[in-house]
Amino acid sequence: AYGAQDGSNEDLLYLNLYYDPINEPLEVAEPGNPTLSDPNRWQPLSLARFIDQSGNEIPGSSPPFLSPEWGNVVPFAMNANDMTVQERDGDTYRIFKDPGPPPYINMQDDPEGSALYKWGFTLVSIWASHLDPANSRIVDISPNSIGNISTFPQDFEDYEDFYNLYEGGDPGQGRLVNPATGVPYPEQLVPLGDYARVLAEFWADGPDSETPPGHWFSILNYVSDQEVFEKRYKGEGEILGDLEWDIKAYFALGGAVHDAAIAAWSVKGWYDYIRPVSAIRWMAQQGQSSDANEASYNPNGIPLHQNYVELVTEGDPLAGDQGENVGKVKLYTWRGPDYIEDPETDVAGVGWILAENWWPYQRPSFVTPPFAGYVSGHSTYSRAAAELMTLITGDEYFPGGVGEFTAEKDNFLVFERGPSEDLVLQWATYRDASDQCSLSRIWGGIHPPADDINGRLMGQEAGVAAFTLADRFFVGDTQLVTSIPDHGGMSLSLYPNPVRQGAHLSIRNVKEGEAAHVQLYDLRGVAIDVKEAITYREDILQLNTRSLAPGVYLLRRRDGSTQKLVVK
């Protein structure tokens, strides 16, 4: 079966073969983060009970990193040109669409990177101060006011101009007119506390919810079911039948999110970057880094921000009975699951808490996905899917100029009660939906900005490339292996097989005159040009595998004799 050959380690139930976390687990229910040894690397979480993606309860669990070696999986449209190879502790990591490292905290050698690290993770806590229905700020969440972002910052130093530190959101100005109707998009004014919570939970990938690629298949189904939508491939030509449309759309979207997963998780596994719950607690444990003349100063501490990040002083309600908390860092933020007894009736709200007790806006049985943060899988998946949807429908806009998803009052949120009133998530374009998905992970306390933008850029490339390849299948511009004939006589002999990437493969039982007629195919049936990599001497063909991405291939002689080749 293909799944046993695609590099996913299906035979061993997808277990990690060599990755090990460098940090000891964080006991999330306990204050602070005393077990973190490297504040730039991922930290497992120790939970009283963990409920996994499928809703299975695992008592007393510290979930392992999910798929840090996913760069070994055979991609759909990506190839060796998209890949770099790194080595750590003698183990190989294949990285697709490598964006380079995230900001690291190292005040001695990299004060600029340290400042970006501290700014980004502090922003996550500040945005969590919006997660309260009692928040008096009212925002317009219609396409009239959100979306329509044309460019992304290319450097971490430019992120402060893209993300609004105190107000939340991005520079998107929205669109005045719905192109499908020719009239302006009507305003939709709702409490920011409701919008941010609904957005975070709509796109969440916790227990009993869809994964990010699953969200986009649901969106594809939503689009396909709209009465005003015409199933024209690329928006052109005749209307396709339901079955043909579904096959093409599912095939192409599957290829896009498959490559997005490989790219994102290859980066996660290599850079192994820390999550906000670990970083925020660790920084606050160091102290504050804003004023050397104030209490608890430490260059690695969290920056102070009036009304959001402050020090506990004498007489503060958080000072403690014996003043034991005076000088500690406090945060004005979402107060966490300790303030929720019944999620159907309770709201944690926002207020001052000790920073050592900070939680992301998630359930205490999940807290944070069990894998590294950089880059955001949601950002990568969603941008890849948005590009694919734009290309396959021939229109960047949802049918009718807007996609709508309703959240009913007190009947949508799962982490706590809410929203406090009905609201409708509205996006004009697929890219607008993708961009809001990315922001949802910051409001949810799962990612800092550093995880986001590079994921979007990687997904953008992956989505376009996946559609380009899928289109070749649809229009017939591919050389396909449709069958593997059974021939008698001497079959091809390959050694070594598997072969390590970059090594020479010896191919026996090929006559000198037949060398030009040996063809290599990937498992999609697409021919790969290896003529320049083949030499012939002493009755043996030598194939240099340097240009081949790791994966499974079919090597075929002119008479149809075919052998499977595995490149490691």
Predicted ranges, named:
Residues 485-568:
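C-terminal outer-membrane/trafficking sorting elements
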Residues 1-480:
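Acidic/polar surface patches and capping/hinge elements
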